[in-house]
A protein has these predicted regions:
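Eukaryote-biased RCC1-like beta-propeller repeat architecture
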Residues: 1-105
Length: 105
């Protein structure tokens, strides 16, 4: 059994909530910023790269917006802004790319 451990380089982030997918995670800061880390396959991290990220990295495509919620699926991530906009990035279960409102992958 694994024991709990701190996510690397997350100490400076005031975390409001977290969501975990099959091989990636997303967190929402109290300032409304979205951070993702883990397996980047299928664009699920929203950083425009397929490289694994070992520590939370801010999703720059959402800069200037305040997110209110974040959620992870197996191959996708979603965020809802405080003004009700929905952003989804990654891959649908059919392995088709998913882009709602704005491309982040």
């Amino acid at each position: 059994m694994l024991s709990p451990s701190m996510v690397p380089r997350s100490e400076g982030i005031d975390v409001a909530s977290v969501s975990l997918g099959a091989h990636h995670g997303a967190l929402l800061s109290r300032a409304g910023q979205v951070f993702t880390w883990g397996c980047a396959d299928h664009g699920r991290l929203g950083h425009g790269s397929q490289h694994h990220i070992s520590a939370p990295l801010r999703v720059e495509a959402l800069a200037g917006m305040r997110a209110a919620q974040v959620a992870c699926g197996d191959l996708q991530t979603a965020a809802v802004t405080e003004d009700g906009q929905l952003f989804v990035w990654g891959c649908a279960p059919t392995h088709a790319a998913v882009y709602v409102a704005r491309s982040l992958a």
